[in-house]
Each structure stands twice: as C-alpha cells, then as structure tokens.
C-alpha cells in the first residue's frame, strides 16, 4: 500500500511513459558529469570577516581558477584585482568609479574575463543547473555568453554586440556584479557548516545573513548553536549563557545592533548592585572593538558578573527540576560556605577568589531576587521578540540537524557518546534508553519540539530544559565532556578544580575500528566513507593532526575563532570534496600585511591607513609600490619601514 502511495505521487509529475523516460534519461546523463564541489567549515564562532572571505574566495580556489584560465596572459596585479572584484564586487565597482577607471574599455575587458571564469567553473554542471543559479534579470544574456562558439565568426560578432549593448545601456556595473556572484555560487556547489556559528566572535548575525543568501547550505548543530536556539525559545539559562559569553568577549554589537537586545536594564542593574565591586575576574576579553555600541570595560565587567550569577541560579533550578540529568555536582551556589568564603567541589574545599555575592541568599542560594526576576523576564521578552534573531534561528532549524549523511560522509559537530570499552553510551529520556544513532535522532526531534510546540503545551518546558542540558550535559553529543566548569573558572584559582574530561569518543575515534563502528551505526559503508567532525580545536602547533582513524576521520576545527588561534597555531581549515579528491586546506596565520600601492588598487593614503593598523596588530608591513606609476608608494615605504 505504501509503494502505491509513492507511485501515485510520482504519477503527478510523470503522468505517462514518455515523461518518465525523459526524466530517467536526464538523470542518467547527469550521473555522467563530475560531482559538484562541496565545502565543509566548522566552528565559525562569529568570525564573520574571516568566514565571509573564505566563502567568497572559495578558500583560494577562485584565485587558482583565474591563474589556470589566464596563465601568463595577465599580470599578477591584474589577477589580484580580478579576484578581489569577484570576492567583493560592490566594493570593487565603487573603487573603479571613484578612481575614474570605470571606462567602456575597463567594463568590456572585465566582462570578458569574468565570462571566461564563468565558463571554467560551470563546466561540470548541466546547463539547466547553471541557469537556475543565474540572476533572473540576466539569465538569458549570461547563458548566451558562456555557451557561445568563439570559432564561429558570426557568433563572435553576436558576442561582442551583447557586451556593447550592456555597456551602452549603462547596465555594466549590475552585470559585472551578477557575474561575480554567479562565479561564487558555481565554485561552491554545496556548503556544509559543521556547527558552532555563534559565540566568541563579533558578528554571528552577519554570518547568518551570508548563509541565508547561499543556494545550498546545511548545518549540523553545535553546542553553541543549541544554546542560542534555546535562548530563542525563551529558556532562561540559555539566555543568560549567550549573554554571558557575548559580554565576556565584548560582542555588544551582535546583541544590540545585530539582534536589538535591550541591555539597558542589565547595565543599570549591574551598575547599581556592583557599584563598589571592581569585578576584576569578569573583565571582558577584547578581541574585537565594538563599532556601534562601545561599552566601558568596567561596566561590562559588572554586567558580566551580574548575568553570570543569575545564570548559576537558573541553571541550579533546572538541575533541581531534573534529577535524571545527574548534575547535582554543579549546584555550586548551594555548596558555598559564606562565613569562611569557600566552596566545596567534588568533596574538596577551595577558597573563593571573589566573595562579593550580594544577590545570593545563603539560606536559599538559587532563588532570584525580585529585581533579578524582573530583569530576566525583560531579557526573555527581548530575545523572543527579536525579529532578526528569530528569523536566523528559524533558518538554523530549517537547514539544520544533529547529523547528515551525504556522499558517503557522516557529518556531526561534537561526538557520538561512548563508554571506555568502546560501546555507545546510553541516556534515558522519558523512561526509554537511547544510544548511537537513535540518541541523535531522538534529540533532533526534541530540539524541534522545544521551538515549535505551542506555548500552552504542557510538555514544552521539558523540551526547553533539555536545550540547556545539550549545551553542557555530561552525555550531550554536541558537548562531549563530563562537566562544564564555568563557575570554577570565575571563582576558584586552582586550575585542577576546572578540569573538564573529554568523552571516551575522542580517544577511541583516533582508531580505525571505532570509526568503522560509527559509520556502520549510521548505515554507511566502511570502505570509502569518512566522518567529518568539528568542536575540538586541532593543536597543530603541538603536533596534533586533523586526520585520524587511518584517514577515516577529519577534525576540521582549526581555529577560525581568534580566541583559539594561540592554541592551534593556524587560522582554521576548509575541507574540500570535489570530483577528484577530498582535500584539507589549512589557513595560515598572517605574518605580514602586503599592500599594492598602485594605480587602480590602493592610494598612498589608503595604504598608509591599512599598514599602520596592521603594525598595531603586530604584523609586518610589505608594500608593492610604483611598479605601474610613480604615485608615492616608495616614499610611504620609507616612512613606515615597509
């Protein structure tokens, strides 16, 4: 009966033998083409500038395509200029107009070169697929240009006439921008984000806008994504958590400009309650300056401490509601000796580094004050009614999952929880035990329930609490550690108290036999399949390798986030899977800032601003100057020591 239902659905699209045969022929022909290129990124952590550049440049592949297409026909400077135009067409076109380079000749040459690159990057796709990626306004024209026969003199005249008409009708800029965007889209056929779009970096919202413009993207949820998803549902612990991390890393632009979260009540509360407290253990880590919402570090520290204390209270309330989480050891506020100024953690007493907790009642440490209750209620309303946040989170839901099987690759962010003996670890939800694939399937359904169930559904709160557990719980597949020592990091000096033990998965998965076990669990063949994983930064500088399990496992968190780069020694990885091979691109940390101070690239004034800023960041200065025209680059090099 079920087969008959499927056949009836197919009959709507293919009502007769001819229609079905035509589609079979089409699909068989497509199978003969090379597969599209897939790109895998992990742990973006709000680093929008780095990610957007990697995405638009296809991690350097577009520059390679330019070199392959033109060889020695154009200079290195022209290659760089063309590449930058493709990556950032709006910026490049503005510069061309500002510098009076936007002539008919420049437009004609640029369009010709872009069409050549389009032909190169579209060669592995069907004409139909390429047309679907074209901007509708220019689809017919672009289709004609990239399929013209240059050996036919009549067609060559036709080709030249099309370009001349584009320029004469003053549509050159729009057409060039359309070609640049098409090249970007054709170079990356499928984009996979292996979790953690949010937290630490300055503007996860800009990353989300970029992802939402992309034609084919999927997301495997990470623990930081889950925390923001939980915050969007109104889970108080998740709201406190994302606020705490954002304030800790000075991400006020994300909160206020990106998502319109009203932080004024929090700042007023913190300034009043912690007026005489320097909050030195809560000073923000300033990796990026705020552009729109600069906040004094002293006030930020008070806000940081205020929201952290509220977080510990509401987390404790969740733990009390759910003894099945087995997280009673995290009830640190209840284990403080306020007279002695100590806290007992796992049976050992430690002195508190910060004893100023004016809102914590020793008789009922987990109870919120009336002011705290009002504050967290207002913050909750701000999160639930943020149009941009809710729009982004709905996209994370609609394009995301706990894992994905695609082209013999198994994608997930954190881990598949395991025991020391190599068996899949178990977790009980509502009286039913889950492990392995079944655990991830159940959690995926539960995550959706937390967001999409109506507010008056009595079970919704249970699912919302589970979102917090997934952020930091000992058997959470997106977290992968036995505990999260946030409290210890703020209040205990002894680093041993803050130790977080990794799930046995991370040791076992370095062996091929356990990778094979996981692949079989998810229904993938052992031969030719791979696991693609993120979450744990690969410390390349300490000799760690991103490739494990005899080539079966790729860990691609290489430190795109600035906060991790001192640990990894690099600036991240991109995994690229094309029709020929699976390749891992390693992104080096910059040592120099190299500027082309030339006509049509950067002026001396622009070059000076760029290089001065680079030197403040500790980068060396290099300059290409006066190779085309003597515009003052050599003098600038002498002035700044480039």
What are these regions (language model features)?
Residues 1-591:
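Feature recognizes metal-dependent phosphohydrolase scaffolds
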Residues 590-642:
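Histidine/acidic residue-rich metal-binding segments in metalloenzymes
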């Amino acid at each position: 009966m079920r087969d008959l239902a499927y056949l009836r659905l197919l009959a709507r699209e293919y009502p007769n033998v001819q229609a079905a045969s035509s589609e079979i022929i089409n699909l068989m022909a497509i199978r003969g083409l090379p597969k599209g290129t897939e790109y895998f990124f992990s742990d973006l952590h709000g680093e929008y500038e780095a990610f957007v550049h990697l995405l638009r440049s296809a991690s350097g592949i577009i520059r390679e395509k330019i070199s392959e297409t033109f060889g020695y026909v154009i200079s290195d400077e022209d290659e760089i200029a063309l590449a930058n135009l493709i990556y950032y067409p709006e910026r490049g076109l503005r510069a061309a107009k500002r510098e009076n380079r936007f002539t008919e000749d420049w437009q004609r040459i640029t369009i010709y070169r872009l069409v050549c690159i389009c032909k190169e990057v579209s060669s592995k796709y069907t004409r139909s697929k390429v047309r679907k990626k074209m901007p509708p306004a220019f689809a017919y024209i672009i289709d004609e240009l990239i399929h013209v026969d240059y050996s036919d003199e009549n067609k060559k005249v036709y080709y030249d006439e099309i370009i001349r008409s584009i320029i004469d009708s003053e549509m050159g800029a729009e057409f060039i921008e359309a070609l640049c965007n098409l090249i970007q889209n054709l170079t990356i056929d499928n984009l996979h984000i292996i979790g953690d779009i949010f937290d630490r970096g300055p503007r996860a919202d800009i990353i989300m806008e970029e992802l939402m413009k992309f034609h084919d993207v999927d997301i495997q949820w990470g623990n930081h994504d889950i925390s923001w998803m939980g915050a969007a549902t109104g889970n108080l612990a998740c709201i406190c958590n994302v606020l705490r991390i954002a304030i800790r890393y000075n991400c006020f632009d994300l909160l206020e400009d990106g998502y319109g979260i009203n932080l004024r009540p929090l700042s007023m509360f913190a300034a009043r309650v912690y007026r005489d407290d320097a909050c030195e253990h809560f000073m923000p880590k300033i990796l990026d300056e705020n552009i729109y919402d600069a906040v004094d570090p002293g006030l930020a520290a008070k806000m940081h401490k205020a929201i952290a204390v509220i977080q510990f209270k509401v987390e404790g309330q969740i733990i009390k509601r759910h003894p099945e989480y087995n997280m009673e050891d995290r009830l640190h506020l209840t284990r403080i000796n306020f007279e002695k100024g100590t806290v007992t953690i796992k049976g050992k007493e430690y002195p508190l580094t910060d004893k100023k907790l004016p809102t914590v009642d020793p008789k009922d440490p987990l109870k919120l004050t009336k002011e705290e209750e009002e504050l967290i209620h207002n913050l909750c309303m701000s999160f639930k009614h943020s149009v941009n946040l809710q729009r982004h989170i709905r996209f994370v839901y609609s394009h995301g999952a706990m894992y994905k099987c695609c082209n013999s690759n198994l994608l997930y962010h954190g881990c598949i929880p395991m025991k020391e003996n190599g068996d899949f670890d178990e977790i009980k939800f509502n009286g039913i035990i889950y492990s392995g694939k079944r655990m991830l399937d159940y959690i995926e359904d539960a995550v959706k329930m937390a967001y999409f169930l109506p507010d008056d559904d009595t079970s919704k709160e249970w699912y919302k609490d589970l979102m917090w557990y997934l952020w930091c719980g000992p058997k959470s597949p997106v977290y992968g550690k036995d505990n999260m020592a946030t409290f210890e990091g703020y209040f205990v000096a002894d680093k041993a108290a803050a130790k977080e033990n990794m799930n046995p998965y991370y040791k076992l998965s370095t062996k091929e036999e356990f990778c094979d076990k996981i692949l079989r669990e998810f229904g993938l063949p052992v031969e030719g399949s791979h696991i693609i994983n993120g979450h744990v930064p690969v410390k390349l500088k300490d000799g760690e390798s991103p490739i494990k399990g005899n080539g079966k496992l790729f860990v691609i968190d290489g430190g795109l986030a600035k906060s991790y780069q001192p640990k990894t020694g690099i600036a991240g990885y991109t995994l690229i899977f094309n029709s020929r091979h699976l390749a891992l691109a390693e992104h080096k940390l910059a040592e120099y800032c190299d500027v082309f101070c030339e006509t049509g690239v950067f002026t001396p004034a622009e070059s000076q601003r760029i290089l001065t800023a680079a030197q403040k960041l500790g980068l060396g200065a290099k300059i290409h100057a006066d190779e085309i025209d003597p515009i003052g680059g050599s003098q600038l090099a002498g002035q700044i020591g480039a």
